[in-house]
Amino acid sequence: MAKHRSNRLAETLKQEISQLIREELKDPRIGFVTVTSVEVADDLGNAKVYVSVLGDSQQAKDSLDALKRAAGFVRSEIGKRVRLRHAPEIVFKYDTSIEHGAHIAQLLRGVKQEEEKDEGESHDQ
């Protein structure tokens, strides 16, 4: 039961925090940020918000720093928007899964090209 509730809250937080970042946060350091997932502790006291940032590593670092500084504001807004007795503590984390997936895709393309090259050479002989 508690897991179901935390999953439901995680999805709600993802939507609300995405909207807050898009519409309310005016920090110029925040670039094109996407909330990829939210993990809420079973006691609903903490929420890890995973974000990805479009741009280079410096833009990602700047955006994450700005989000961390705005965590208190985000928490207070969540408390107003979502009916909870206590709003969870918000912690922003950089999500590297998209970069990791792109790296794996690049490696797979390289393997495929090598295989095609090897097949082409074996047919020539």
UniProtKB/Swiss-Prot annotation:
InterPro entries: KH_dom-like_a/b, RbfA, RbfA_dom_sf, Ribosome-bd_factorA_CS. It is found in: Cytoplasm. The keyword Cytoplasm applies. GO terms for biological process: maturation of SSU-rRNA. GO terms for cellular component: cytosol. Transmembrane segments: none annotated. Keywords: Cytoplasm, Ribosome biogenesis. SUPFAM superfamilies: Ribosome-binding factor A, RbfA. GO terms for molecular function: ribosomal small subunit binding. Belongs to the RbfA family. Monomer. Binds 30S ribosomal subunits, but not 50S ribosomal subunits or 70S ribosomes. This is Ribosome-binding factor A.
